[in-house]
Amino acid sequence: MPASWPPRTVIRKASGLRTLESALYRNGLGPVAGVDEVGRGACAGPLVVAACVLGPNRLESLAALDDSKKLGEKERERLFPVIRRYALAYHVVFIPSGEVDRRGVHVANIEGMRRAVAGLSVRPGYVLSDGFRVPGLPMPSLPVVGGDAAAACIAAASVLAKVSRDRLMVAMEREHPGYGFAEHKGYSTPAHTAALAELGPCAQHRYSFINVRRLVTAGTPQISGGLTDAEPGQCCELG
């Protein structure tokens, strides 16, 4: 393999979803793990990061990942158990809102990616991350622009993270009724903003986010109870 591999620090989508992964496997750098997150921009709920290792061969049962950007909720739910079944390894990490506040979103995101890779039962030879460079990994890695549309392992990690977080937000709505978490999943929508103004923030809101902090500064009552903040770095391996 030439010393210049990879030829650029950031690679965009090539001719197919498995092109980059196949090149890494051919050059002896497998297994290849993909890492992605969901919930960076939400003002409530955890940041969820998933890492996933797929085998070198394309599986027809995961063909829908080729259009992962277009997947709706039902298709993601259908793919979720299929990915868990056929992945060589996967790990999902939940960074609670309190830790996001303490660390900041970007630092929490990078730390979550490191934890997700560290939790894999199969040690990857190479890691592909969706858009963000992940320092501190014990193996080579590459940030990929639009990664969930450029590498199957990142697309699979994206589905695992998205479904895991969405399910948690639905459960959070039962613990904190009135905010509409099951619908907007913690993102700042007009309905969420109206609920925040009426009810005040709860323990699952990110107080470092300006729309939440502004309400606290204005003296809006805060609601506690329900789901508690997880310990820093709490993670779970699904399946």
UniProtKB/Swiss-Prot annotation:
Q: Which GO terms describe its cellular component?
A: cytoplasm; ribonuclease H2 complex
User: Which cofactors does this gene product need?
Assistant: Mn(2+); Mg(2+)
State a single Gene Ontology molecular function: RNA binding
Cofactor remark: Manganese or magnesium. Binds 1 divalent metal ion per monomer in the absence of substrate. May bind a second metal ion after substrate binding.
Keyword Cytoplasm annotated: yes
UniProt GO BP = DNA replication, removal of RNA primer; mismatch repair
Q: Which Pfam families does its entry note?
A: RNase_HII
**Sequence similarity:** Belongs to the RNase HII family.
Question: What is this protein's function?
Answer: Endonuclease that specifically degrades the RNA of RNA-DNA hybrids.
Q: What is this protein called?
A: Ribonuclease HII
Source organism (scientific name): Mycobacterium sp. (strain JLS)
Gene name for this UniProt entry: rnhB
